[in-house]
Regions:
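Bacterial N-terminal signal peptides that target proteins for export
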Residues: 1-10
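C-terminal segment of classical bacterial N-terminal signal peptides
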Residues: 15-24
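A contiguous strand-loop segment
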Residues: 25-126, 163
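C-terminus-biased signal that marks the final domain/tail of proteins
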Residues: 25-40, 48, 53-54, 67, ...
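Alpha/propeptide regions of enzymes that mature by internal proteolysis
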Residues: 33, 124-158, 247-261
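Short acidic-glycine loop/turn motifs at beta-strand connectors
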Residues: 33-36, 100-102, 173-176, 182-187, ...
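Short helix/loop capping segments that flank catalytic or ligand/cofactor-binding pockets
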Residues: 50-51, 109, 116-117, 179-182, ...
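Aromatic- and glycine-enriched pocket-lining scaffold segments that form the walls
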Residues: 145, 149-183
Length: 261
């Protein structure tokens, strides 16, 4: 079996968090295949308000975190089984994107207005995990996508800050398999992401359906044809992509990423 690996490339434009997340609209994730079969998972993190103290974080095996809970307190402790590295904002615990020693990568993406977490409950103290700590939690405990799904079934994910948007997540393993997690009306919904693209709102299944609006787009140049007694030809290469959206809304970025990658 051909050996596959995941390299996570993270391109940072600016960073913000918490209340500043209301100004953040542009995260785009793509997936590329190398000639040797390796999978490259890449993304942008484009936040408008400030850099908000973005930093690289290296977390060794056996490191212990405390889960944040609403109101500024701390909840359960969790200890990393695997070492991992990534990019965090504001403080080390709030990792936005990372990869562990097993090659599993995880990242969160802004997901306003369409997600809804379950309500925080003290009764779930031992299984509560805040949304902005889920990347760290998963990277420290899981090696495969199936393990991610099993681990998430054992926890309760709640909002870290009521002023912040909900988020959704992308998880990718060395085999190339990738999933998206969204929490809709308090329920975890998983999607197999064979396309390898993720942006923001609306939901992932809507973004896939929206690609049907661009079924006419093809690589290359449109062939000449006649219209009545006129002979028509394109102005140049790329004309078969005429109609590709050029704005920076999440649906348009999703379409561009899907066709360009």
């Amino acid at each position: 079996m051909k050996r596959l690996s995941i390299l996570t490339a993270i391109i940072l434009a600016a960073a913000a968090l918490m209340a500043s997340f209301q100004n953040c609209y542009a995260c785009t994730g793509i997936t590329l295949k190398a000639k040797d079969g390796s999978t490259v998972v890449a993304r942008t993190i484009e936040w408008a308000a400030s850099d908000n103290d973005c930093r690289w974080v290296v977390v060794p095996r056996g490191h212990t975190w405390k889960s944040f809970i609403p109101g500024g307190g701390t909840g359960r402790s969790f200890t990393s089984k695997y070492g991992y590295v990534g990019v965090a904002v504001v403080q080390d615990e709030l990792m936005m994107e990372g990869m562990n020693e097993k090659g599993l990568s995880a990242g969160l993406f802004y997901f306003p207005d369409y997600g809804k977490y379950e309500e925080y409950s003290e009764a779930n103290h031992e299984t509560n995990i805040s949304d902005f700590q889920l990347v760290s939690y998963i990277l420290g405990r899981c090696a495969t996508v199936d393990e991610v799904k099993a681990e998430i079934a054992r926890v309760h994910i709640h909002g870290f800050d009521p002023r912040s948007s909900t988020v959704h997540w992308r998880f990718a393993e060395p085999s190339g398999r990738q999933i998206v997690l969204e929490i809709i009306d308090g329920k975890c919904v998983f999607y197999e992401n064979t396309l390898g693209v993720l942006t923001n709102s609306p939901s992932f299944d809507w973004q896939l359906t929206n690609l049907n609006n661009y079924v006419n787009l093809l690589p290359g140049r449109t062939e000449p044809h006649t219209l009545g007694n006129m002979s028509l030809s394109s102005f140049g290469g790329g004309s078969a992509m005429l109609g590709l959206p050029g704005d920076f809304t999440p649906p348009s970025r999703f379409v561009r990423a899907a066709f360009f990658q």
